[in-house]
Amino acid sequence: MSFQTVFQRYELKYLLTQEQKKKILQAIAPYMELDQYGRTTIRNLYFDTGNYRLARHSIEKPSYKEKLRMRSYSQADPESPVFVELKKKYRNVVYKRRIALPEKEAMEWLQGGSCSQDVQIFREVDYFLSYYRNLAPVVFLSYEREAFFSEERIYKTSFSKYGTAYQSMIYPGLVQPVYAKATEPGTVREAVCYG
């Protein structure tokens, strides 16, 4: 399976009504087409420190921020491939590096184990893990996405719809979402945006 491991792009994000989405789809129709996967369910498990250092920093809207997540495009089991992604944003430019691993191996690595791979992206994630120390999964976020690309695949427009579908969780029975105050370290939370 071939996949892109390094990304650099500008991201502009907007909240849209259904009517606005419809108008944008009409406007881009001559120039862009739905990607090969159509509508996709994306599941992210974000890692942070016990005091939510990464999330708190991100909320401050700094010129530089970073995050670590595990992403799946299907319901994952221990042998399913997932992506470990290190995402950094500097002055509106997003840099993303990712690697594919079986879910069980990825989770063990991200929670303090070691990884047998020796490529640059693994070393970058290892550095991130050692720098922030004791990272744990804290937020699960699932949403539906439709992505459209220009013919040259230079431009991408995507629409994401967030919801509360518990059945689409990446870890059934392991990480159950609970609503908790951000001051409760180690509590997994589900972030839900309605739109």
Functional labels for PLM-detected ranges:
Residues 1-195:
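Phosphate-end processing signature that detects enzymes handling 5′-triphosphorylated RNA
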